[in-house]
Amino acid sequence: LLISTRFLRKVAINRRNYFRKRKENNKFRGIIMKNYEINSRTLAIVPVGENLTNVLEEDNEFMINMNSMKIIEKSCEFFGSSYMGRRTGTKVLTGISHKSPIIIEESTNMIYFPTTSPRLIGCIWIALDKIKEYKEVNGKILVFFKNRRKIFINISYGSFDNQYLRATKLEYILRSRKKLEN
């Protein structure tokens, strides 16, 4: 992967601006954590450059010194599986093989979906069950979470809607299987 100097400068400037905004808004207090496992309060995993991630929770916001894909992988492992195992499970259940939604934890239907290819540095992961609604605003998506938090995502409406529907399909299949078991 060839990364230009211009791109790296842009990432550094974005990081500085990001931290400045967070300090002004008083949501981010400057603490950077080394590890994080996705939990029932996690709303979104938002990368800030290559090895730094902003995690939005219902009541908190954390900076993690780890890329977003690593957080997803570690969270899958924390709940007893690997990312590749979860991805294969999604493919078997739904037939989806690219930009797959992932079941982080099955008993509580903790499902996350990527906004782009998970291999890309800028891939954001969103918790399906935390979304209240989403709409297009000036070519971007504004996601409203159930707890009234919101986030802008630089993605087309069609692409976001497709990812949301894929995750919903996975959730429906999981719920249907659980009903058959009972």
Regions found by a protein language model. Give the residues of each.
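Eukaryotic intrinsically disordered, low-complexity regulatory linkers and tails enriched in Ser/Thr/Pro
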Residues: 3-126, 132-182
